A protein has these predicted regions:
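Nucleotidyltransferase catalytic core that binds NTPs
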Residues: 1-169
Length: 169
């Protein structure tokens, strides 16, 4: 059996995150999502838009997600949380993957990347396209038309065709 792990702030959760979760889940039997806590988001952007409890509740309810876990790290990584997941669950899985969204690229200097390699966890990059951003949503830059256009461009770039007149109902 395989376990996929995704991490992030998810503040707020949007369709780009869901796409990443679906792609990560397609690679594994189970998907764990590490949700950064409010302190992390305070350091990153001043204050969270949604509390970690709200984000956890929404993420746990999503179909591809097996388990949502709040990050226990006190720095700006999820290394301690990854170590804990690996320690507790490694005996249950043949392979563990640490998956990153489409806007992330291989960065051998990132602490999580180095940790994964040392633990035997396989880093996976480029899951999904940058069709939406939490910061775009908060800034009010996403109208339905703009989002439909982004999704349509991604669908077209992948050689797929939408049969619906509108991607959203």
């Amino acid at each position: 059996m395989k376990l996929a792990i995704v991490s992030g702030g998810f503040d707020p959760v949007h369709v780009g995150h869901l796409e990443c979760f679906e792609k990560a889940k397609s690679l594994a039997d189970h998907l764990f999502v590490i949700v950064n806590d409010d302190k992390f988001l305070e350091r990153k952007k001043g204050k969270p838009f949604m509390t970690w409890r709200e984000r956890m509740t929404i993420i746990q309810a999503l179909k591809p997600v097996t388990m949502a876990i709040v990050a226990s790290d006190k720095d700006d990584t999820v290394c301690e949380t990854l170590k804990w997941i690996h320690k507790v669950f490694k005996s249950r899985y043949d392979e563990i993957l640490f998956c990153n969204g489409g806007d992330r690229t291989i960065d051998g200097d990132k602490p999580e990347h180095k940790l994964c390699l040392s633990l035997g966890v396989k880093p996976v990059y480029g899951l999904g396209d940058k069709i939406q951003s939490s910061s775009w949503l908060i800034a009010g830059e996403d109208s339905l038309e703009v989002l439909e256009s982004r999704v349509a461009n991604v669908v077209k770039s992948q050689g797929r065709q939408s049969n619906a007149g509108s991607l959203f109902f």
